[in-house]
Curated annotation (Swiss-Prot):
Protein name: N-acetyl-D-glucosamine kinase
Highest classification ranks of the organism: Bacteria, Pseudomonadati, Pseudomonadota, Gammaproteobacteria, Vibrionales
Source superkingdom: Bacteria
Sequence positions that bind Zn(2+): H157, C177, C179, C184
Family according to the record: Belongs to the ROK (NagC/XylR) family. NagK subfamily.
Amino acid sequence: MYYGFDVGGTKIEFGAFNEKLERVATERVPTPTEDYQLLLDTIAGLVKKYDNEFSCEGKIGLGLPGMEDADDGTMLVVNVPASTGKPLRKDLEALIGRSVKIENDANCFALSEAWDDELKDEPSVAGLILGTGFGGGLVYEGKVFSGRNHVAGELGHMRLPLDAWFHLGDNAPLLGCGCGKKGCLDSYLSGRGFELIYEHYFGEKKKAIEIIQAYNEGESKAAEHVDRFMELLAICFANLFTGLDPHVVALGGGLSNFELIYEEMPKRIPKYLLSVAKCPKIIKAKHGDSGGVRGAAFLNIK
């Protein structure tokens, strides 16, 4: 049995999956964001409950909006401050008495998609999230590739490529990022970035859904903005694809529901790739909000 925990700033979602990777149990509980011992006890309590229910010792995986220090095992999780600076994995292993795997939630999203029936035979899958922020995860041969420092999928903190600056023109917005730097992809390719770029060029604050609705109604400013954003997205995706060369790319997050992306990217990306390279297949993620808990559980698939 595979146990997955999607640990967020408000709730912990638990899922149990059998050997056929079918979900057989679900539970949601509030996240103890400020009390570390209560956080440990909450996770351990769910493990014990479902061990008893299924008469087994499930394999445990956690996905969190943060990362584990590769050297000392301490966590950096902004939305769950109780765990920041603490060796969460080691403490859980000591409390539960078995191995625990921890990954960034974007990597779990990518892993969930990579183990979908239609993608599980693909050698490599990139999962890219166009949500409140922009991030991603890399899966090679069915396993998350997180790198030496566990930051291999932190694509949102790569900077805009030169072609993107030229495309945005002399009046290009220099947007700050929560990491403290400027020019991160997170600030441009996210739903938030979609809105900020519109505001920069037109001096109006609008929600992404309002801009897209205006585009669908043929409004000229929205059309100009969407064309600018699609080209920006193509440039940045091509830059990422040149380095990662994934076989398939699955898009998640709110902005991934903008169907025009799937029409425009295959047409716009190729001119920014090497002449021998082809644009990978780009699809909408299938598993939505359940991707985090699925991917966390699947961290233990051999």
